[in-house]
Curated annotation (Swiss-Prot):
One of its GO terms (molecular function) is metal ion binding. One of its GO terms (biological process) is protein insertion into mitochondrial inner membrane. It is a peripheral membrane protein. It comes from Yarrowia lipolytica (strain CLIB 122 / E 150) (Yeast). The twin CX3C motif contains 4 conserved Cys residues that form 2 disulfide bonds in the mitochondrial intermembrane space. However, during the transit of TIM10 from cytoplasm into mitochondrion, the Cys residues probably coordinate zinc, thereby preventing folding and allowing its transfer across mitochondrial outer membrane. Heterohexamer; composed of 3 copies of TIM9 and 3 copies of TIM10, named soluble 70 kDa complex. Associates directly with the TIM22 complex, whose core is composed of TIM22 and TIM54. Interacts with the transmembrane regions of multi-pass transmembrane proteins in transit. This is Mitochondrial import inner membrane translocase subunit TIM10. Belongs to the small Tim family. Keywords: Chaperone, Disulfide bond, Membrane, Metal-binding, Mitochondrion, Mitochondrion inner membrane, Protein transport, Translocation, Transport, Zinc. It comes from the Eukaryota. Disulfide bonds join 41-66, 45-62.
Amino acid sequence: MSFLGLGGQNPNGPSNPQKLLAAEAELDMVTDMFNRLVESCHEKCIKADYSSGDLNANEGLCLDRCVAKYFDVNTKVGEVSMRGADGNYGLEDTANTVHAEAWKQRILHGPTLNVKYVHRIKVHEIVRLTMVYLAPWHFN
């Protein structure tokens, strides 16, 4: 079977073009998000002058926090976008809620925001999970 079922015999019948376009758009979105995540966290956490081939403890911790915060913000933006799709933007309420939650976390846990709903995932795990997610698209 070829990439995304194009040009080959599909045993389940003809592919729905809308599903194909949706799958391609989703793949583009996930790839773009991953690339922006890597670029942003690499720029913030890893010094330009490499002294070692491995991450030190501070770099690893910084990357873990950066990834967790990135996904937390991405989730919140998605929630606001979904409300916008329903015609109920509620941006002011959402901003106040996010600000209040961040302030509460800062008071409870110190100056770094404790992301409560995002599991701490190591960067190599994100790469692995992304490849597992993308593998059906690239390797079928």
